[in-house]
């Protein structure tokens, strides 16, 4: 009888510890994601600051990192450009839980799209993912920095699990091989509500 009593006490204690751990995990999950802006060395520092400033208007938890070299393994010699998926893989290795890294470059970047082995793009972000990359190479001269910011915030959205959005003014609009950034103004309400479920704390 006494043995059963001790066994019951042990089970209760283990259950309490388990509940405590679950509560701790919930507290950790409630922390907002921190966006790390990672410029590559080809980037102008003023452009990096502009993009970071624009992101902060929407989402305040952000830090600019020191500029680094583009990873050598991402260079695609045949087309004189860089593979976006390789850049993302490189950045992801150095991105821990609770952080998302956005790489910024002026160089041309590409990825495989369907039957096209090397398709030039403005940016790439996997859904979900720890990192993404945006390039200014394919942007027009008018409002170039503003366009660059919109490409960056679009790719960050993908890392958080957002799909392309049918709302034409939303940052998550599908470019469809074009550059619709001048028509984009903000995340739509549906996309914002989704980001809130990912612990985004909007201003």
Residue locations for each model-derived region?
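Metalloprotease/metallohydrolase-associated module, dominated by Zn2+-dependent proteases
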Residues: 119-147, 163-203
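Bacterial Sec signal peptide processing site at the extreme N-terminus
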Residues: 20-31
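Metzincin-family zinc-dependent endopeptidase catalytic domain
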Residues: 45-151, 163
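C-terminal motif of bacterial Sec signal peptides marking the signal peptidase cleavage site
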Residues: 15-18
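Bacterial N-terminal signal peptides that target proteins for export
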Residues: 1-7
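Catalytic glutamate of the conserved HExxH
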Residues: 151-159
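Fold-level signature of zinc-dependent metallopeptidase catalytic domains
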Residues: 30-43
């Amino acid at each position: 009888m006494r043995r059963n009593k001790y066994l019951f006490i042990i089970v209760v204690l283990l259950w309490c510890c388990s509940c405590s751990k679950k509560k701790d995990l919930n507290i950790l999950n409630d922390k907002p994601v921190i966006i790390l802006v990672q410029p590559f060395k080809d980037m102008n520092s003023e452009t990096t600051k502009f993009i970071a400033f624009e992101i902060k208007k929407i989402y305040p938890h952000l830090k600019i990192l020191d500029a680094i070299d583009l990873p050598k393994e991402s260079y695609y010699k045949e087309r004189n450009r860089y593979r976006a998926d390789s850049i993302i893989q490189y950045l992801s290795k150095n991105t821990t839980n609770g952080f998302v890294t956005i790489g910024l470059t002026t160089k041309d970047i590409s990825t495989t799209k369907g039957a096209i082995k090397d398709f030039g793009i403005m940016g790439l972000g996997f859904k979900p993912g720890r990192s993404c990359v945006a390039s200014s190479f394919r942007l027009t001269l008018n409002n170039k920095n503003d366009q660059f910011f919109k490409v960056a915030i679009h790719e960050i959205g993908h890392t958080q699990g957002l799909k392309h959005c049918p709302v034409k003014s939303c940052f998550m609009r599908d470019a469809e091989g074009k550059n619709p950034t001048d028509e984009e103004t903000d995340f739509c309400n549906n996309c914002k509500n989704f980001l809130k479920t990912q612990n985004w704390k909007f201003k």
